[in-house]
Amino acid sequence: MAKKNINHLKHGKHSKFARFFVDKRSTRSVGGNIVLIIFLTLLALMFLFPIVFMFNNAFKPLHELLKFPPDTFVRNPTLDNFLDLSDMFSNSLVPLSRYIFNTFFIVIIGTAGQIVIASMAAYPLAKYEFYGNEFISKLIVMSLMFSTAVTAVPNYVIISKLSLIDTYWAIILPAFSSTLGLYLMKNFMSQVPSSIIESANIDGANEFTTLWRVVMPIVKPAWITFFILSFQSMWGVTGGNFIYSENLKTLSYTLGQIAKAGFWNVTGVDIARQGVVAAVSLIMFVFPVTIYIIIQNNVIETMTMSGMKE
């Protein structure tokens, strides 16, 4: 059957590109496959090298960190960098547990809010025709071209007028308006067959129930992918422009300040804190990557999902 389809593509009335693709695929040699595998392996190693280097740096003693040229792998692993970081927090007026609570509170509420709001906004845009639908969809695409730096000043003005400066909501509320999440959810919800929604309505389900009990399970790969993107974004938010009280600051902000202090002080480069900087980098990197590894299958499913047809 497959051979018949290939012959049909070769001799049928199809584009030159399709015939060229089939010819190349059917005549590709074993040597070509080996070259492709070698190329992809080298590409993977190139992306993996910075991660391996960062992991090893976190456990290097100071004399290995300052060695030039640097060694990729640690020779005398130590936990001194993490112990130094712990000592810095123990001498702080605010305990480490408070920074961790602030971070997870902001990340969890912000991420959940983005998914809920983006899904509820995307559903009518994807499944219902109304005046202005196309205009709103184009506006969403256009808004993706704007950097967050462009909206920094308007966000500050709005947050200030709402008297939310120096509160958790100064960071959480701006995150709720995620155009990327709205765009992603709309595209996937538009692939859900309308017959499924009509069947749910016939069975007596209202729009709210249809969205959360029928549509959301179908587009699970999409909102899990959005969850990862949102989590990574919220995890890296410092909130330094909106929060001034030390007991409300996030772990990301505090670790970032420690890293900056490790690079520079009044006299120049602060050599003594380079190990702490390496430990900070690893801590900020590990948790988002762990979340991604746990649910990576859903992300891959999102990338390979070809759509559904009635």
Predicted features along the sequence, with ranges:
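A hydrophobic, multi-pass inner-membrane permease signature
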Residues: 2-310
